[in-house]
Structure formats: C-alpha cells, structure tokens
Regions:
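Long compositionally biased, domain-poor regions of proteins
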Residues: 16-18, 28, 32-35, 42-47
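Mature exported/compartmentalized surface modules and terminal targeting/interaction regions
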Residues: 3, 39, 46-116
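Short secondary-structure capping micro-motifs at structural edges
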Residues: 3-6, 18-22, 30-31
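Short beta-strand-centered segments at strand-helix junctions
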Residues: 15-27, 70-78
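Short, surface-exposed charged micro-motifs
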Residues: 6-8, 31-35, 94-96
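Solvent-exposed loop and beta-edge segments used for protein-protein assembly and interaction
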Residues: 10, 26-28, 98-100
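Glycine-rich loop/turn
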Residues: 1-13
Length: 116
C-alpha cells in the first residue's frame, strides 16, 4: 500500500512541511512549485525546473524527513482562503498523487488539526 502524500501547515511558525515521501512520490525533485487554486480550495506541490522563477529549491544536503518552507505572506494568503484555520494551530493535509504530472494535490477542506 502506497503512503498518501502529506504536508503539515504550521500557522504559528508560518511554515509548510513537505514530507519526504511526498517529494519522492513526485519524482524526488531538486525544485518544487506550490500552486494554490482558490476556487477548488486546493494546494498543489509540483515537480519544478531550475529555470522557472516560481520554483523553490530543495536543499538535499539538509533534507532529512521533510522539507520546510517558511513564508509569512503565503500563510496570510492561506488564512484568508481558510479563515477557520487558527493562527496558532498545525494542520495535516493528506492528498492525492497525480503521477502523470509529478504533482500532489491537497484539499484545504480536508485536514486534521495536529497538537503541538
């Protein structure tokens, strides 16, 4: 059985933690892109290319169990889209893999609150 792609959204630390198995599922990229669809309330993590200005570099030398991305503006945008998310909570999202696109998609309506 394959493990579902998983991310953790930490509103308090303004962080998205992308689990290592999620990165492996989308092709173990050196760069990723985050895609937010506000109409469908989804967040996508896609294999990125180095020449794409929106791609974020994954530093493999520091990668252990997950990749952490810190962004106050991104968290503010997510909070605006999901006002029920509290600023001091952590949210685990399990998504679906779209293998043909090297992408994982997460519904922001389907989450679990994680205790600190």
């Amino acid at each position: 059985m394959m493990v579902r792609p998983t991310i953790l959204i930490d509103m308090r630390k303004h962080r998205i933690r992308i689990h290592k198995h999620t990165l492996q599922a989308i092709g173990d990229p050196d760069f990723v892109m985050l895609i937010i669809n506000p109409i469908e309330y989804t967040l996508g993590i896609k294999y990125g290319l180095p020449d794409d200005k929106l791609a974020l570099r994954i530093r493999k030398s520091t990668l252990r169990n997950d990749y952490e991305l810190y962004s106050t503006p991104l968290m503010a945008a997510l909070h605006q889209l999901c006002p029920e998310w509290k600023e001091r909570e952590n949210y685990r999202l399990e998504g679906e893999l779209i293998a043909t696109e090297n992408m994982a998609v997460f519904s922001m309506r389907d989450y679990t609150v994680v205790e600190h």
